[in-house]
Amino acid sequence: MWLLLQLVWLCFLLSLGLNSWHQSKVPEYPDELRCGLRSFQFTINPLSQETETPPVLVAWDNHGLPHSLQNDSDCGTWVSEGPGSSLVGEASYSGCYVTEWESYYIMTVGIERAGVSGSGAFIETKLFKCPVNLPDVPNAGLCDSVPVWDRLPCAPSPITQGDCKQLGCCYNSEEVISCYYGNTVTSHCTQDGHFSIAVSRNVTSPPLLLNSVHLAFRNDSECKPVMATHTFVLFRFPFTTCGTTKQITGKQAVYENELVAARDVRTWSRGSITRDSTFRLQVSCSYSASSSALPVNVQVLTLPPPLPETQPGNLTLELKIAKDKRYRSYYTASDYPVVKLLRDPIYVEVSIHQRTDPSLELRLDQCWATPGADALLQPQWPLLVNGCPYTGDNYQTKLIPVWEASDLPFPSHYQRFSISTFSFVDSVAKRALKGPVYLHCSASVCQPAGTPSCVTLCPARRRRSSDIHFQNNTASISSKGPLILLQAIQDSSEKLHKYSRSPVDSQALWVAGLSGILIVGALFMSYLAIRKWR
């Protein structure tokens, strides 16, 4: 019997060692992404220089199912070993694992790495995102030809290579100024309605006279360069100044301006000459005429009298998704789409925007999810019904109290809840629908805050009604972007194409089988010994 106990204990220890592969914490690691003209080009580095095993890559298709990422010309993927146990990969924008969302190509990659000194394995999902219309990124010659002492910062550090390239600038992670302008003309339009134009003196041959470069229609003090060096001149000005013209073409609002450079002309009694290049640059920015990011002409006048304590006005709401249950940080518009595994928690916050009346209390009426940005799109799934969790869900929505002791200025202006992520299912084919999931809520404001009439009571059991009815005097709000929900590798119930099961799983099965044989054998030997003794 003592031998039997030893065998059982040995199997238990082996199982703990194998299970630690699933429980390790994911560390930080440096990786690189380059947005090519036709494909993602990325490098996945090992966790440590001491690690000799390269990471293992997994990609998810449009149905949320995982596949081993390997060389596959049909799916447009190529993977090879790089220096120092790293992996170099490429994925075509038109391949099996890339989705076009708004103005970006997106791809989710799962990375399994071996820990330092064989301490276990780590898995993390990584979202690759590249713009559909890439800006004109300067080539290596235009970047390397700028001396270090003449480099003009394009964006403050730290900045990723992808973000720097989106600005059309040069990138070198080993320099103090990692993102800088190349020897060309670099222009971009900001979301707050400004032109940003950098001109290199070497954009023409012979070089420009930088001190003569100016806006063609206005040369006021506010229209002069904001920065000038021996090699570069930088202009930054609003669309509403410096002679900028505006035209509405269809659904597009186009803002245009022009830069010119004077020439040094030498004159004598019999003629004039110049050795300078002709330079005339027209820049334009296009915005959707219906976009909320469209710049507006704002005039600053004398301050109006203070607003009364209570006044009628439009109800403006904001729906945000927090990065963790503490609600310390939130996903911004640039973070979408947010990638989550099925059943992962999503922490939602709805708040009253731009109101300072402490007597207001926000009440959530209905909250629901759709597979598209349209709040009325079908199918739908209820999250909150009349302010209470929908009881027809086996993973019910959880209401999260906003305490008075929180650091929020007006706690009654906030409502929070969490949901477990899910995927919509085709009611006919009984298969998970591909595509994103959007969240929506309708809400109203109650006064005075804290009174019984402003409190929503949720009984233990409610009628399973999933109909969404909008009440009068309510406002609706939607998430800033979609959620992409993936099927977990370990939970996949379907046979995965091109994906082999983890060697750890096969080892676990082998240990379990061997344990069973040893236990049965030990019991049988004990039985024979007892029978012989009798």
Swiss-Prot record:
Keywords: Cell membrane, Cleavage on pair of basic residues, Disulfide bond, Extracellular matrix, Fertilization, Glycoprotein, Membrane, Receptor, Secreted, Signal, Transmembrane, Transmembrane helix. SUPFAM superfamilies: Trefoil (SSF57492). Its main location: membrane. It comes from the Eukaryota. Disulfide bonds join 367-441. Glycans are attached at residues 71, 202, 219, 292, 302, 314, 472. Component of the zona pellucida, an extracellular matrix surrounding oocytes which mediates sperm binding, induction of the acrosome reaction and prevents post-fertilization polyspermy. The zona pellucida is composed of 3 to 4 glycoproteins, ZP1, ZP2, ZP3, and ZP4. ZP4 may act as a sperm receptor. One of its GO terms (molecular function) is acrosin binding. GO terms for cellular component: collagen-containing extracellular matrix; egg coat; extracellular region; plasma membrane; protein-containing complex. GO terms for biological process: binding of sperm to zona pellucida; prevention of polyspermy. Expressed in oocytes. It holds the Pfam family Trefoil. Residues 1-17 form the signal peptide. Proteolytically cleaved before the transmembrane segment to yield the secreted ectodomain incorporated in the zona pellucida. The N-terminus is blocked. Residues 462-534 form a propeptide. The gene is ZP4. This is Zona pellucida sperm-binding protein 4. The chain crosses the membrane at residues 510-530. Residues 141-183 form the P-type domain.
